[in-house]
């Protein structure tokens, strides 16, 4: 028989039929697909929505969430049992059979994958198959860490008796499922208490120990709360202390504990692991934060000698998740004042202080009509609130708690269609009808996962050693915290670090050149000393896990003029989607192109809502305001942003990530830190890394003194030494595969078909048109890029080889190997492993194709060179450059030396080949806009490349060659070029052929536009004249004879492909200096009509400075021609981005001009100085 469930409100009983319990209707779900199992579910045709009213406001809602109820309600048809504490709950230990376990697991996994929008996905199916396999083999299974965190939060969200659930997502989960002993449990619980107490700024947390297997190896915490006061019962029946703890106090005494016999003796922790008999552990006094109670008005209140502990941590309940029963899973929130003032101190079966307080107040306690109990209770609550706030301890008053719960009900009704709530427990024990929850009808039902009552451990424990006289285990040796810590420290290094390793630190990077990855991996090494750290590229990160991260560190560079790197675009879009979901917008509303566009990121990098939390923000007052909590409210984060101040939108992507993480509720550990490529980037990271490590250790209450010293040494220590790196002979790898592995791209080998200088054979300048054979598997669209994998110059490679110490054959194929140490239960194990990125090839090939030898060495590499120098002057100079940021930047700017020039400047530096190779960074691809259209040149890819050569030291230094442009200049027809393509979706042609197009591209910025007009030509040839929108080109160069593709442009004008071509000449004699933005101003009316009135598209390609000037010019044109205010024109420009009508393809400084570099370096120095100030 299925009993009716009850909705209870002021004695009114509303019945409904619950769904069939999973326990009652277990089916064999083995070997079923998810779809088959859904068809197998019992029909729930009798279910109807529950109408719930608010008697005060007359508002009504329909609860449908109860359809998912999986447990019979406590009420009978003849009686309502809503006020019975354990009604309908089986407290006895029970092991679920496989079929029932699988049914629960199936339900939970459905909920989990639905929450991450992957219900019935291949990942869901694979996970379910894995669980089925585990259960079939072992009778149980393991939740993943992310599933566990999700389940713990959802269980709090489902708890019908909790009034503070609005903060359900802000729960720190300590995964302690690997603990096997009571001492390990005690260490974890001490960490939990320390973390959650947080010097009074209470934080919600749960610690989860191994789940039940066969019922004979349970882990249990015998205390009902982690911190509680003893109840000492005298022979006359009176109790000193807390009467609620008398029975458990006697258990502790029989185990050997001895209290002091005061009203507030803190009970020890009694713990049993793996079904063994319990041990007890005294909590160290410094771990238990107690608040002495005083009153703001009555001075005598403090004379009562009352106090209470700050942390309410429930430890006797069972966490039931996915069919797994976690019998030891203590959790905490923070106190509501009435829990202490009304219940703990006021209840007659607790401290029963109301009469004493009333007598002190000189109230007449002989008759209830004086309301002395009510008055005394109010003042007790006043004292509790006053005392907690006086000592800066988090607490919430019952009015604020009730208001927050009403907000939570509203949220849940919108998000889930209902909210389980037990009216008897939700309504505060004081001022009930003065709170809004009193008037709200509620539906009480139970959802999984959840927190469930279970039988007291001492009532069901099977003792291994029996003391016949007392019926308990013989007296145990008492364990002190210091003894445990000492034993852990000296007996097992692995176990000693296990506690900190339970806290995961996820480090994400987004990079184009590899610098962000390098800094991120160094950060990972530092955090591995105290956390379980993992380093991932943003594109490899599973965004479904972000809500459940405890610690998130981001190292992000900015690409171009504010864009994310290619491997960060998906992350940017996902963050934006979360933000839109939080704002209640439908999923289809989000614009992924907008989310990763430069203008959008620039705008969002300059805003910061007050709702985002700093670490120093306090919740010590009333915490009922839910507005500051977002979907990432449980995430602590810090961001290090890399960029170049040569670009106007400096570090825009890192700022964007920092702001969005904050706006989504994340807690910022330290303020955004930037590293400027123009000055002191490595130094900025070296300053930021130890700071964020120290703050993180403090946040998670990890002892960081000794660990901090070990970790920060990683910043200054050599990653490899002569004894930890070596070359071994090995067969050569395929070059194409090796390059693909290094760059994590599909690399193609493509022959060069043709090459010519667009300025003519006699010109002193060279801008090349390269025609490359296109592999049939390469696909691209006009506007996309090619990444060219160039070779370093032969003379550089030869020179470096001549400076190496060893006489290794540079043409023999070798493999670089690193000696790695791994700590195992058997001790430290050392193994030689291949370098994770470099291939097996010759030393010459490594220096030619795989390693960067032209970028000035970093301070870390110079410090390494100092250790290799035999001349004291070389050592001193190199050490100065490595440690003095200003000296390094001046040296770097003036000489911009390549590796060979450094070795020549410091000739006493002699380096082992393997050691040098291990220190160098990868040679990065050089990107070029494709200058052709596949619709016109089906088997070719064209590139437009300006050959870069310059002299350092104001033109008086040695000549330097651009790596890729000079490689392409030297390559001969028929030789193979290794390359890959990169999509540029924000720079593709409009979907509508009729939309006007304005193209602005001085110099080689014309490259992608050649592909545009070729595509339009092919379209017209294939489809006929048709109706095409105008296509106008604004091109600029220094002199008329440097006009690129002049004849081709004239031909396109005659063909009607190009509507107009405008030429700006900046150095032509006898005419005024003119730039492309000047011509835009001349054509302002036409530009306005095409862009604003006709909905045209605007494309800009070139260096970042030009692009910023063009953007400002277009903005001014639209404002002037449209008579717009600043606010209106800014909104219009952002709307163009939103509609993907403003397109930028931006690259950095083309030549190292003194004007640009001096300005950028000066701004970088000012920024560094400001960041170093406290």
Swiss-Prot record:
Annotated (6R)-L-erythro-5,6,7,8-tetrahydrobiopterin binding sites: 83, 425, 438
InterPro entries, per database record: CysJ-like_FAD-binding, FAD-bd_FR_type, Flavdoxin-like, Flavodoxin/NO_synth, Flavoprot_Pyr_Nucl_cyt_Rdtase, Flavoprotein-like_sf, FNR_nucleotide-bd, NADPH_Cyt_P450_Rdtase_alpha
Activity control: Stimulated by calcium/calmodulin.
A Gene Ontology molecular function term of the record: NADP binding
GO biological process, one term: nitric oxide biosynthetic process
Span of domain FAD-binding FR-type: 745-990
Flavodoxin-like domain span: 505-693
Catalytic class of the enzyme: oxidoreductase
Residues at which L-arginine binds: 225, 334-335, 339, 344
EC numbers for this chain: 1.14.13.39
Cofactor(s) required, per the database record: heme b; FAD; FMN
Superkingdom of this protein's organism: Eukaryota
UniProt: FMN binding residues: 639-670
Catalytic activity: 2 L-arginine + 3 NADPH + 4 O2 + H(+) = 2 L-citrulline + 2 nitric oxide + 3 NADP(+) + 4 H2O
Residues that, per the record, bind NADP(+): 998-1016, 1095-1110
Pfam family, one: FAD_binding_1
Amino-acid positions noted as binding heme b in the UniProt annotation, renumbered to this chain: 162, 453
Cofactor binding summary note: Binds 1 FAD. Binds 1 FMN.
Known role: Produces nitric oxide (NO) which is a messenger molecule with diverse functions throughout the body. The production of NO in the salivary gland is used as a vasodilator for blood sucking.
Family: Belongs to the NOS family.
The protein's name in its UniProt record: Nitric oxide synthase, salivary gland
Protein species of origin: Rhodnius prolixus
């Amino acid at each position: 028989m299925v009993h009716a469930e009850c909705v209870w409100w002021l004695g009114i009983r509303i019945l409904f039929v619950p769904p069939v319990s999973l326990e009652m209707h277990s089916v064999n779900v083995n070997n079923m697909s998810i779809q088959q199992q859904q068809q197998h579910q019992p029909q729930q045709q009798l279910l109807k929505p529950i109408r719930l009213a608010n008697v005060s406001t007359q508002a009504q809602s329909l609860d449908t969430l109860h359809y998912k109820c999986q447990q019979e309600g406590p009420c009978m048809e003849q009686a309502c049992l809503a006020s019975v504490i354990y009604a309908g709950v089986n407290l006895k230990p029970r092991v679920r059979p496989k079929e029932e376990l699988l049914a629960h697991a199936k339900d939970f996994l459905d909920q989990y994958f639905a929450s991450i929008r992957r219900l019935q996905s291949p990942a869901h199916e694979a996970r379910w198959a894995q669980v089925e396999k585990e259960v079939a083999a072992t009778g149980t299974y393991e939740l993943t860490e992310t599933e566990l965190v999700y389940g713990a939060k959802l269980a709090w969200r489902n708890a019908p008796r909790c009034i503070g659930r609005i903060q359900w997502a802000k729960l720190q989960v300590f995964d302690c499922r690997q603990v096997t002993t009571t001492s390990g449990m005690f260490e974890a619980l001490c960490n939990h208490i320390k973390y959650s107490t947080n010097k009074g700024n209470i934080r919600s947390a749960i610690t989860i120990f191994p789940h039940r297997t066969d019922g004979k190896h349970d882990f249990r915490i015998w205390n009902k709360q982690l911190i509680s006061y003893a109840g000492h019962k005298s022979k006359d029946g009176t109790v000193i202390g807390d009467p609620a703890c008398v029975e458990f106090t006697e258990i502790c005494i029989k185990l050997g504990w001895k209290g002091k016999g005061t009203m507030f003796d803190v009970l020890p922790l009694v713990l049993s692991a793996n079904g063994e008999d319990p041990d007890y552990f005294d909590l160290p006094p410094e771990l238990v934060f107690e608040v002495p109670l005083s009153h703001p008005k009555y001075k005598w209140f403090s004379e009562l000698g009352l106090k209470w502990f700050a942390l309410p941590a429930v430890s006797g309940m069972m966490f039931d998740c996915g069919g797994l029963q976690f019998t030891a899973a203590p959790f905490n929130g923070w106190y509501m004042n009435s829990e202490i003032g009304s219940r703990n101190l006021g209840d007659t079966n607790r401290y029963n202080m109301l009469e004493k307080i009333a007598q002190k107040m000189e109230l007449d306690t002989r008759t209830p009509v004086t309301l002395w109990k009510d008055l005394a209770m109010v003042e007790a609550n006043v004292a509790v609130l006053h005392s907690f706030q006086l000592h800066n301890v988090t607490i919430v008053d019952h009015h604020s708690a009730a208001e927050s719960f009403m907000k939570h009900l509203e949220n849940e009704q919108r998000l889930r269609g209902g909210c389980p709530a037990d009216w008897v427990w939700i309504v505060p024990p004081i001022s009930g009808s003065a709170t809004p929850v009193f008037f709200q009808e509620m539906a009480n039902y139970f959802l999984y996962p959840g927190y469930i009552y279970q039988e007291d451990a001492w009532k069901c424990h099977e003792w291994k050693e029996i003391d016949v006289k007392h019926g308990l285990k013989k007296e145990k040796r008492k364990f002190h915290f210091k003894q445990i810590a000492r034993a852990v420290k000296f007996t097992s290094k692995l176990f000693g670090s296990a506690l900190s390793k339970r806290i995961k630190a996820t480090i994400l990077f987004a990079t184009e050149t590899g610098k962000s990855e390098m800094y991120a991996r160094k950060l990972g090494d530092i955090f591995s000393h105290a956390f379980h750290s993992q380093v991932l590229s943003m594109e490899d990160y599973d965004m479904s896990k972000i809500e459940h991260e405890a610690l998130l560190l981001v190292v992000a560079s900015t690409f171009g003029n504010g864009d994310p790197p290619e491997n960060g675009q998906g992350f940017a879009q996902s963050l934006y989607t979360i933000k839109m979901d939080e704002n209640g917008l439908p999923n289809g509303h989000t614009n992924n192109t907008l989310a990763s566009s430069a203008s959008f990121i620039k705008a969002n990098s300059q805003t910061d809502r007050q709702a985002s939390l700093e670490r120093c923000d306090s919740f010590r007052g009333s915490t009922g305001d839910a507005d500051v909590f977002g979907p990432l409210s449980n995430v602590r984060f810090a961001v290090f942003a890399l960029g170049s101040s040569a670009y106007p939108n400096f570090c825009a992507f890192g700022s964007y990530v920092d702001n969005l993480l904050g706006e989504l509720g994340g807690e910022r550990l330290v303020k955004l830190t930037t590293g400027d490529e123009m000055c002191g980037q490595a130094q900025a990271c070296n300053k930021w890394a130890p700071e964020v490590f120290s703050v993180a250790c403090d946040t998670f209450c990890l002892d960081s003194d000794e660990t901090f010293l070990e970790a920060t040494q990683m910043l200054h220590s050599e990653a490899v030494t002569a004894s930890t790196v070596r070359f071994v002979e090995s067969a050569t790898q395929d070059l194409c595969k090796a390059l693909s592995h290094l760059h994590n791209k599909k690399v193609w080998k493509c022959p060069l078909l043709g090459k010519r200088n667009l300025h003519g054979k006699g010109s002193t300048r060279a801008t090349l048109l390269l025609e490359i054979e296109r592999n049939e598997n390469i696909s691209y669209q006009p506007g996309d890029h090619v990444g060219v994998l160039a070779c370093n110059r032969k003379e550089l490679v030869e020179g470096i080889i001549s400076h190496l110490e060893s006489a290794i054959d540079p043409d023999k194929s070798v493999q670089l190997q690193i000696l790695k140490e791994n700590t195992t239960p058997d001790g430290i194990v050392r193994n030689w492993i291949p370098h994770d990125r470099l291939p097996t090839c010759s030393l010459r090939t490594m220096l030619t194709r795989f390693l960067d030898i032209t970028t000035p060495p970093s301070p870390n590499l110079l410090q390494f060179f100092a250790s290799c120098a035999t001349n004291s002057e070389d050592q001193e100079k190199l050490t100065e450059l490595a440690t003095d940021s200003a000296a390094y930047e001046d040296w770097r700017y003036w000489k911009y030396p390549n590796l060979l020039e450094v070795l020549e400047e410091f000739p006493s530096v002699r380096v082992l080949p393997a050691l040098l190779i291990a220190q160098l960074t990868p040679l990065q691809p050089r990107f070029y806009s494709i200058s052709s259209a596949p619709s016109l040149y089906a088997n070719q890819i064209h590139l437009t490349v300006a050959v870069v050569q310059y002299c350092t030291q104001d033109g008086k230094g040695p000549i330097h060659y651009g790596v890729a442009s000079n490689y392409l200049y030297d390559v001969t027809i028929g030789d193979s070029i290794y390359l890959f393509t990169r999509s540029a979706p924000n720079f593709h042609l409009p979907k509508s052929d009729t939309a006007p197009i304005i193209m602005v591209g001085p110099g080689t910025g014309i490259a992608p536009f050649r592909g545009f007009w070729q595509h339009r030509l092919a379209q017209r040839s294939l489809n006929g004249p048709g109706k095409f929108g105008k296509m106008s080109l604004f091109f600029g160069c220094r002199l008329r004879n440097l006009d690129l593709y002049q004849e081709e442009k004239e031909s396109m004008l005659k063909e009607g492909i190009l509507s107009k071509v405008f030429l700006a000449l900046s150095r032509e004699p006898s005419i005024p200096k003119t730039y492309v933005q000047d011509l835009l101003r001349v054509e302002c009316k036409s530009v306005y009509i095409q862009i604003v009135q006709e909905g045209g598209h605007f494309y800009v390609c070139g260096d970042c400075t030009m692009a910023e000037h063009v953007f400002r010019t277009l903005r001014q044109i639209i404002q002037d021609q449209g008579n717009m205010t600043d606010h209106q024109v800014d909104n219009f420009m952002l709307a163009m981005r939103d509609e993907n009508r403003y397109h930028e393809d931006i690259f950095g400084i083309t030549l190292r001009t003194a004007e640009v570099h001096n300005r950028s370096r000066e701004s970088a120095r000012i920024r560094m100085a400001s960041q170093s100030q406290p």
